[in-house]
Amino acid sequence: MKSVYEIYAEFLLGRVRFHLREETDVFHASLASFIDAKYVASASLSAALYERIFTTRLICESANPPGFVPSQDNLAVQLQNLRDREDEVINRNRLGFRAITKQLAEAGVLTSAEKQEYDTFYTDVRNPVAHGLTSRLYERFSGRVPDHPFEVDSAYESVYRSVAHTLIDKIYFLMGVRGFRKE
C-alpha cells in the first residue's frame, strides 16, 4: 500500500484520473482531509467516491446503444444518452452496488474475481463507514473485539486513519493503476 503522500503526489502529477471533475474534487478533498488529520471526513468522502466510481463507469460504459459511433457531430445525442442512462440506473432502476458490478462484469469490464473482490470490500469497508458502524471497523482494522464499550470510541481516530488510508489506496489503484476510467 502506498502512503497517502505518495498517492497525493501521483494525483497532483495527473496520474490519477476520474470520469468527472466532481469525482476529482472529492478525491482531492479526501486527500486534503487525510493530510489535515480529519480521518472521519476523509473516510466518508472516499467511501462515497468508491461507490460513485462504479456507478459512473457503468453509465459511461452503457449509455450509447450497440454500434453507436461517438463523434463531434453527435455530441448532443451522446449527452442525452448519458443523461437517460444515469436516470435509468439511479432513479428508475435504483441499482445497488452489487447490481452495478454485476452489469459491469456482464459487459466484460470486470472479471468475476474482481466483482467479488469489489463487492466484498464494499460490504466490509464502505458500508460500515457510510452507516457509522465504527465498532465493525474497529474489529476489522485492529484484528480484535473491543474489551469494553469505550475502547472503540477512544480509538476511533486511529481506526479511521487506517480506514481512510485503505479507501484512498483502493481508489488510487482503481483510477491510477488499473485505469478503470473509460477512455
Name these PLM-found stretches.
Residues F27-L31, I35-I59:
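Short, hydrophobic, well-ordered secondary-structure elements
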Residues R17-R21, N91, T120-T123:
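Alpha-helix N-cap/helix-start motif at coil-to-helix transitions, marked by capping-box chemistry
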Residues A105-E183:
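Charge-enriched, short contiguous segments at helix-coil
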Residues L45-S46, N64, S142:
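"Short basic amphipathic alpha-helical interaction patches in structured regions
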Residues M1-V40, P65:
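Charged alpha-helical initiation segments
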Residues K38-L45, G96, E117-F121, V125:
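Residue-level detector of well-ordered alpha-helical segments, enriched
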Residues S46, I53, R57, E61, ...:
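Generic structural signal for hydrophobic core residues of well-folded globular domains
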Residues E61-Q116, R136:
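Flexible secondary-structure boundary motifs
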